[in-house]
């Protein structure tokens, strides 16, 4: 992303700050979008996420995109959108369609597919930046976002029969759900694992290319 530094006068520090805001909001908004998915349906939560994603990328491409606006588009909006469009909500929604016996396999396939995407996307982005520039690369991202936006419309709502073996407390509040989650050892270890992921993978992806 050295093109940002040259064309938008965005320093590496400002770019790193935007990615930091993005990662923070990704983690912060994922439970909120999960709440929306439980209340109103996963298709609506993912659709909203792609709308915010598209707005962030469009502003980065064609709107005010320097200074604080760079943090707003790449940091605030894209980070918020990732809370709905990354793995958490889709994995949860897919899992609701399967019984306990098949749920692990189904969610594993979704997670593995997302991991392949995480591997391919940086390679595609790097190639596109070199060959076509950052503006065209953002346009390509907008195309993918539109595809995701359309696909989210056809996300099938969960039928009661598909999730009948999932114990759900309809009266449980959001705060109570968070407290319950942190009493589960596996959940705590998973959260710690994502902290490690952020410190090494996000750090490498953000700063190493400059060198």
Label for each model-derived stretch:
Residues 1, 185-211:
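Extracytoplasmic gate region of multi-pass secondary transporters
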Residues 23-31, 118-119:
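Residue-level signature of mid-helix packing/kink "hotspots" within the transmembrane helices
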Residues 29-41:
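Helix-to-loop junctions at the C-terminal end of transmembrane segments
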Residues 51-65:
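C-terminal ends and interior cores of transmembrane alpha-helices
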Residues 67-85, 195:
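Hydrophobic core of transmembrane alpha-helices in multi-pass small-molecule transporters
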Residues 84-98:
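Intracellular juxtamembrane helix-capping segments at the cytosolic ends
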Residues 110-157:
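Helix-loop-helix hairpin linking two adjacent transmembrane segments in secondary transporters
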Residues 157-176:
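Flexible cytoplasmic inter-helical loops of multi-pass small-molecule transporters
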